Amino acid sequence: MPGVTVKDVNQQEFVRALAAFLKKSGKLKVPEWVDTVKLAKHKELAPYDENWFYTRAASTARHLYLRGGAGVGSMTKIYGGRQRNGVMPSHFSRGSKSVARRVLQALEGLKMVEKDQDWGRKLTPQGQRDLDRIAGQVAAAKKKH
């Protein structure tokens, strides 16, 4: 659909569609440790979904589309959460830096993301085009139903 951007579609449907696209393309470099890692220190278990790396990459690409100029540190803030400390009060805890770094490096390998000259990383024009194309497909599928 012409004129449809990432902002115009449901974020959950878009992230699922982009994750499926990344998995189907087979070009995203997935580390071998993805089945044994926790995503943050406040998490108790590893993710149940075996395709979580594709979902995280899709979510990160969407975040860079909307805001841009985000680095590893800001990604750890986004994917952080509440650390439960037993009888002591809960506090905010950041997400894994290694996971955030590897996701951004994998997206750089696809030429969807590049390092910004100021700080962090930003979406390339090719990456923005891919995300808009997938958003158009999601909107067309939604309109069909």
UniProtKB/Swiss-Prot annotation:
Q: Which InterPro entries match?
A: Ribosomal_eS19, Ribosomal_eS19_CS, WH-like_DNA-bd_sf, WH_DNA-bd_sf
Q: Name one GO biological process term.
A: ribosomal small subunit assembly
GO MF terms here are:
RNA binding; structural constituent of ribosome
Q: Which residues carry this modification: N6-acetyllysine?
A: K23, K111, K115
**Modified residue annotations for Omega-N-methylarginine:** R67
Instruction: Give the record's GO CC terms.
Output: cytosolic ribosome; cytosolic small ribosomal subunit; nucleolus
Tell me the function of this protein.
Component of the small ribosomal subunit. The ribosome is a large ribonucleoprotein complex responsible for the synthesis of proteins in the cell. Required for pre-rRNA processing and maturation of 40S ribosomal subunits. Part of the small subunit (SSU) processome, first precursor of the small eukaryotic ribosomal subunit.
The subunit structure is: Component of the small ribosomal subunit. Part of the small subunit (SSU) processome, composed of more than 70 proteins and the RNA chaperone small nucleolar RNA (snoRNA) U3. Interacts with RPS19BP1; the interaction is direct and mediates the integration of RPS19 in state post-A1. Interacts with RPS19BP1.
The family assignment reads: Belongs to the eukaryotic ribosomal protein eS19 family.
Which protein, by its recorded name, is this?
Small ribosomal subunit protein eS19
